Amino acid sequence: MQTPEIKEGTEQYLWRRKTMNPGDKGVKRKGSDRQREKMSVIVMAGTEDARRIISRLSGMPWVEVTATATTEHGSDLAEKSGASRTVTGALDSDGLRELMADLDACILIDATHPFAAQATENALRACRETGTIYVRFERPEVIPDGVIRVGSFREAGEVASSLIGDGEVVMHLAGVSTLGDVLRSLEPERVAVRVLPSTSSIEKCLQLGVPPSHIIAMQGRFSAEMNLALLREYRAGAVITKESGETGGLPEKVEAASELGIPVILVERPEVNLEGEAVFGNINDLMDHVLKILRDMGQPGD
């Protein structure tokens, strides 16, 4: 397991089991002689949805929010949204379980991306093993008409390779982490990819052989007009994207491609068994549920 980095305000340090100051930020260890000054909630972040949830929770003075994210960029955004503590780095179920114990967490809110199936499975396992309450925010599915639905990015690359003509490229709008599978069936110079403007994302594209002129480093959600301009500029003959919902800008991508008559290859979400779990597609409903749980537990000092 990669050791995550924890950041509290301006102080940064590496997390090790039992090295976190138990009195820091109002966190107390479990025990009959100790009482939490604040109720600890973990939010698995890295999405716009998570940032909205963090912002809502951070406005409650009796709740302390710890956000986890796989990248420094994700942690920075979570901190700006109001998280009092951020944990940067991938956490497996053991890492999450130890973090829950160190924070004496009441609830874990999983607001990770719909395609972060492994993260969700890790969270479910850790919560079941510790008895921590698990709550999932799941973006409502959006499947536009006319798209080509596939089950994997490798399959998406295979389909795209059969659709583009001479001088055309595949516009990859599904992030750098999925690019390697797509390139199994396509030469790197036949792909243009839009990625976050981070050094790691750009370096990965270059390592995979994508020409620098085909790397579009931008952060958004983008309008249909912006997508349309990019598709025209790069002479896209097909688009690869994933079912990331409205928050992920899927409708705008499909609208732009449809205007140009370009086929859209849509990779469907991986399935995770959430039967019996509290799953919400609306943040207001999720917050109502979480607040009821916290009030039933009793605010600190009750």
From Swiss-Prot:
Q: Which Pfam families match?
A: CbiJ (PF02571)
**Region (Disordered), start-end ranges:** 1-37
Answer yes or no on keyword S-adenosyl-L-methionine.
no
> According to its UniProt record, in which pathway does this protein act?
Cofactor biosynthesis; adenosylcobalamin biosynthesis; cob(II)yrinate a,c-diamide from sirohydrochlorin (anaerobic route): step 7/10
Q: Which PROSITE patterns match?
A: COBK_CBIJ (PS51014)
Q: Which InterPro entries match?
A: Precorrin-6x_reduct (IPR003723)
What is this protein's function? Answer: Catalyzes the reduction of the macrocycle of cobalt-precorrin-6A to cobalt-precorrin-6B.
Return the similarity comment.
Answer: Belongs to the precorrin-6x reductase family.
* Protein name, UniProt field: Cobalt-precorrin-6A reductase
